[in-house]
Amino acid sequence: MTTLEASYARCRELNKAYGTTYYASTFLLPRARRPHVHALYGFCRYADDIVDDLGPVPVAERAAALADFGARFTADLAAGDSDDLVLKAVVDTVLRFDIDVECFDRFLRSMTMDLTVATYETFDDLMLYMDGSAAVIGEMMLPILEPSDLGLARPPARDLGVAFQLTNFLRDVGEDLDRGRVYLPQEDQIGRAHV
């Protein structure tokens, strides 16, 4: 049986190992909030690893693994607990802070897009993807951060998520090309630059 403490520790390890910039930023938060931010990172990392790090596994198998992960998360959430080392902390965080589960659905939809969509024609097309891959992360964070006005905080939280994602796209251009993906919009950016 996985303990809640071990689950939060695993999420923290994932955040520290793979999201060093995001991990460092958690030190700006009150100590009691940090484990919950690590849990959200753990969820996102788990899904991202299914999409990107299964090596030469066929797309259909990765899609099935991602769907299974989503179904397991939904079932664990309904049960109020999980035996999974990462999901146990995620379920606890979602329930403790009443995070909108629809945010996780949108995130998983965007991760599924990564399996089949290799390029984005326009910035508007890319924004549809980033709504679930980035903006939604800001929405997930808000209940943990407890702003005084949730409605007022939502747009900048979404915008910050998108800004982080765009920065990652620029930083990871080579890595994304190796995976057969181009996140820079063809028409809006590359076409104008004649790249």
Regions found by a protein language model. Give the residues of each.
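Acidic catalytic motifs of isoprenoid enzymes
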Residues: 1-192
